[in-house]
């Protein structure tokens, strides 16, 4: 799980305005951090299939947010992909 201070750090880096916590960019960045954490977790816990299902769900959520952002504003989409290093 993501620690509160780490989450606040991510929000601070990707927010669009001062009180922004729910923009697609922030949500995508938080989900990406969770995906990275779970990927590392699976390197040592190969048989943790329950969490692997959760990972697939998170990846699907992120994909949906990325599709939404691509449809609404292509420049913001390209920017967030480049910042996070997500391959597409």
UniProtKB/Swiss-Prot annotation:
It comes from Geotalea daltonii (strain DSM 22248 / JCM 15807 / FRC-32) (Geobacter daltonii). Part of the 30S ribosomal subunit. Forms a bridge to the 50S subunit in the 70S ribosome, contacting the 23S rRNA. GO terms for molecular function: rRNA binding; structural constituent of ribosome. Gene3D superfamilies: 6.10.250.3130, S15/NS1, RNA-binding. One of its GO terms (cellular component) is cytosolic small ribosomal subunit. NCBIfam families: S15_bact. One of the primary rRNA binding proteins, it binds directly to 16S rRNA where it helps nucleate assembly of the platform of the 30S subunit by binding and bridging several RNA helices of the 16S rRNA. Belongs to the universal ribosomal protein uS15 family. This is Small ribosomal subunit protein uS15. Pfam families: Ribosomal_S15 (PF00312). Keywords: Ribonucleoprotein, Ribosomal protein, RNA-binding, rRNA-binding. One of its GO terms (biological process) is translation. InterPro entries: Ribosomal_uS15, Ribosomal_uS15_bac-type, uS15_NS1_RNA-bd_sf.
